[in-house]
Amino acid sequence: MRPRSGGRPGATGRRRRRLRRRPRGLRCSRLPPPPPLPLLLGLLLAAAGPGAARAKETAFVEVVLFESSPSGDYTTYTTGLTGRFSRAGATLSAEGEIVQMHPLGLCNNNDEEDLYEYGWVGVVKLEQPELDPKPCLTVLGKAKRAVQRGATAVIFDVSENPEAIDQLNQGSEDPLKRPVVYVKGADAIKLMNIVNKQKVARARIQHRPPRQPTEYFDMGIFLAFFVVVSLVCLILLVKIKLKQRRSQNSMNRLAVQALEKMETRKFNSKSKGRREGSCGALDTLSSSSTSDCAICLEKYIDGEELRVIPCTHRFHRKCVDPWLLQHHTCPHCRHNIIEQKGNPSAVCVETSNLSRGRQQRVTLPVHYPGRVHRTNAIPAYPTRTSMDSHGNPVTLLTMDRHGEQSLYSPQTPAYIRSYPPLHLDHSLAAHRCGLEHRAYSPAHPFRRPKLSGRSFSKAACFSQYETMYQHYYFQGLSYPEQEGQSPPSLAPRGPARAFPPSGSGSLLFPTVVHVAPPSHLESGSTSSFSCYHGHRSVCSGYLADCPGSDSSSSSSSGQCHCSSSDSVVDCTEVSNQGVYGSCSTFRSSLSSDYDPFIYRSRSPCRASEAGGSGSSGRGPALCFEGSPPPEELPAVHSHGAGRGEPWPGPASPSGDQVSTCSLEMNYSSNSSLEHRGPNSSTSEVGLEASPGAAPDLRRTWKGGHELPSCACCCEPQPSPAGPSAGAAGSSTLFLGPHLYEGSGPAGGEPQSGSSQGLYGLHPDHLPRTDGVKYEGLPCCFYEEKQVARGGGGGSGCYTEDYSVSVQYTLTEEPPPGCYPGARDLSQRIPIIPEDVDCDLGLPSDCQGTHSLGSWGGTRGPDTPRPHRGLGATREEERALCCQARALLRPGCPPEEAGAVRANFPSALQDTQESSTTATEAAGPRSHSADSSSPGA
């Protein structure tokens, strides 16, 4: 037997072999010399570059375990792991069955080994490098070998060999098309436990970008902002809705209260004497023109309960109450029942004032065509609408201004004193006139014209007593005043005293004046200016270029001018072209040099005394009509003359006053420019008459613009000779002073004073050189000076543009030349030649003191006119007045009128040649009068 020691030498031999292997292994595992420092820095930078960021991308590995049960069912368990994508492979998702591979198994290059089917995920656990000092393949080579065998992805456990990460990253230049993932730490332990214990497991690799910490921050801010804004809007809407509901409830309560305060009446068609809205109405309403309900369009039945709104409109109570509760306004006029201010008795007071105001009527003087230049501002006053006793709407003014109280008496109403007066020019002197005129008979049936016209869509009617001042203020005229009793020396001589003079300098005004829309020029249309008065209740728009713009209820008709041409057409008596105070400003004919006549209808001018009164020639008319309430025609001192005589008071029983208007238009259709001074109103007016009633009288007066003339006998005053004014032309239209008729004797003692003509024209514009046509004896003289159009006047204006200023005559003392009973304001001076329904008469004595010469001679165009004495002039003018009286008297026999007409043309021819001498005589006197006048 061998001893045991014999075995020990063998054990010693094995140790020796191990020792020998270690040095050999150590010799094989010697590392190459370390690379230089710049190379290491480059590698670090490369690792810190995009590759490092790419290597940090996370790979989510989801391992699904399948456990089979005895019944054949499978139970799945999912385990989530986290790894990193290596730069050696692609960064994408992959899925497949897990197959564990040994590192040495990947080194086998035997082609006989079975290849796995495509779609598996290989899991390789790397060992320590010391255990494999001489590996057959690198880690990257092993990954390539696995992909070649059909692996969709390769997962390396680098927990024991961290250097493998760097080896994998070295293959970034030629990466694989399949993902290469490495895991370590706890995730690697979980993965290896699953691989070692489970036979069937499936891995799903997903690539997810790293979540940003502010990924949903913007969305959160937006949602928060949206929620806040929504809440704010919701709160505001709720508040607004609640406020509207409270306001609606309040308005409904106010409407109910207003409805409770409104009166209800029972309709009674049998009661004819009681009017709607009258103060005496108790519990019934009378029938009127509106006997049907405007809502249901059914007629009122006796005993039906009607609701009367504060605007005096009435409806069925059952029809209007729901509307009023919902809309709070009148269905007819939109009157707000909640905002109604004032007491219920205001309508009654207004109705009573209106009924009293209707008793006083006035016809405005003639308006001459031209362009108006207003010298003061025109503010607008608020108005409100009410109803008169006839059911017609009237507009009332609301005045808050306070004018110069010193100009009005204590008895003057407050609404009159609230208007500032307009200071007028006192530039015209007076003259003597001994003519007597007849009083005007108040008996005249007024008719209401139908509304017609295309100049304005809705008539602006003002028929209340107070509304006349809007007309005056809009036109820039003076304002009225009511005075006390007149002096006893001016007692009325006629049936009644219409204008008792006053010595306190009061102002003139009409009682009722309507205001129409402002004038404007349109092609083929007319101006819609109309001065309408109390005896009418509807404003009229009219066409001045047609044979009658509206239909009328009147059966009588006459002839009137409806165009600027010489044609004469039939017009009804109450045509809108001839309403009292209406005026036409339309320039229809392009060929005619002058505008048409002012359209005025007939008005009765009946004499109250058979033989002692007369009517003046044709010209501007002052027509007064009305009823007994007396008013005063005050007088204002004029600086144009140094002496005066008492004026007689008119014998008309009317309580009307004189008024004037200013209107605005283009004199010619082709005018476009105009030069005006700051405070001047200039005009040139051509009057054109129809040749149907009298011979075509043509007379051109030459002279200074301050030469006055008589409104009755149509004679200008004499003027001293003087040099001509040169190229600066002046033209003046004169109307005599206001006329009175009193009870004093015909030869009463004169009083100092002077008067101013009613119309004054300023010489700022170049006048026209055409003559002025007159029909009969005009009451207004138109004086013009023929000058060169390119003269040195310096006005720089166009000759087609003219202006006119229609003003009041304000005098403090009666003018000279008119004895008591000499004139009558109620006399109407016809403008239209065919409107001769007045009993015209001329005085037996005409005491004009003029130096324009006789009317009876003829002279050549170059024959000088001698200056005649005062006595000879008076005799010739007296004869001239008698001839004119015979010519204009409607009842004149044909043979007598023919005899007069036979002698009359010679006088007219004579007067046409009398321009130069009168102009030279009026020059110095005009300048002296201007220097002595203090101005307006």
Swiss-Prot record:
Q: One Pfam family name from the record?
A: zf-RING_2
Q: Where does this protein have compositionally biased stretches of type Low complexity? A: 913-922
Activity control, as annotated, is:
Negatively regulated by R-spondin proteins such as RSPO1: interaction with RSPO1 induces the indirect association between ZNRF3 and LGR4, promoting membrane clearance of ZNRF3.
Which parts of the sequence are RING-type zinc fingers? Answer: 293-334
PROSITE patterns, per the entry: ZF_RING_2 (PS50089)
GO CC, sorted alphabetically, is: plasma membrane
Q: GO MF annotations for this entry? A: frizzled binding; ubiquitin protein ligase activity; ubiquitin-protein transferase activity; zinc ion binding
Q: Which reaction is the catalytic activity of this chain?
A: S-ubiquitinyl-[E2 ubiquitin-conjugating enzyme]-L-cysteine + [acceptor protein]-L-lysine = [E2 ubiquitin-conjugating enzyme]-L-cysteine + N(6)-ubiquitinyl-[acceptor protein]-L-lysine
Enzyme class, one word? transferase
Which Gene3D superfamilies does the UniProt entry name for this protein?
Answer: 3.50.30.30, Zinc/RING finger domain, C3HC4 (zinc finger)
- Which EC numbers does the record give? 2.3.2.27
Q: Which residue ranges have biased composition labelled Polar residues?
A: 654-684
Q: Which keywords fit this entry according to its UniProt record?
A: Cell membrane, Developmental protein, Membrane, Metal-binding, Signal, Transferase, Transmembrane, Transmembrane helix, Ubl conjugation pathway, Wnt signaling pathway, Zinc, Zinc-finger
- Name the domain of life: Eukaryota
Residue ranges that the UniProt entry lists as topological domain Cytoplasmic: 241-936
State the InterPro entries in the record.
Znf_RING, Znf_RING/FYVE/PHD, ZNRF-3_ecto, ZNRF3_Arkadia_E3_ligases, ZNRF3_Znf_RING
Signal peptide location: 1-55
- Compartments, record wording: Cell membrane
Q: Name one GO biological process term.
A: regulation of Wnt signaling pathway, planar cell polarity pathway
Mapped to this chain, the residue ranges on the Extracellular side of the membrane are 56-219
- Mark the transmembrane ranges: 220-240
UniProt main location, coarse: membrane
This molecule's function is given as: E3 ubiquitin-protein ligase that acts as a negative regulator of the Wnt signaling pathway by mediating the ubiquitination and subsequent degradation of Wnt receptor complex components Frizzled and LRP6. Acts on both canonical and non-canonical Wnt signaling pathway. Acts as a tumor suppressor in the intestinal stem cell zone by inhibiting the Wnt signaling pathway, thereby restricting the size of the intestinal stem cell zone. Along with RSPO2 and RNF43, constitutes a master switch that governs limb specification.
Its assembly, as annotated, is: Interacts with LRP6, FZD4, FZD5, FZD6 and FZD8. Interacts with RSPO1; interaction promotes indirect interaction with LGR4 and membrane clearance of ZNRF3. Also interacts with RSPO2. Interacts with LMBR1L.
State the family it belongs to: Belongs to the ZNRF3 family.
User: What name does this protein carry?
Assistant: E3 ubiquitin-protein ligase ZNRF3
Q: Which gene encodes it?
A: ZNRF3
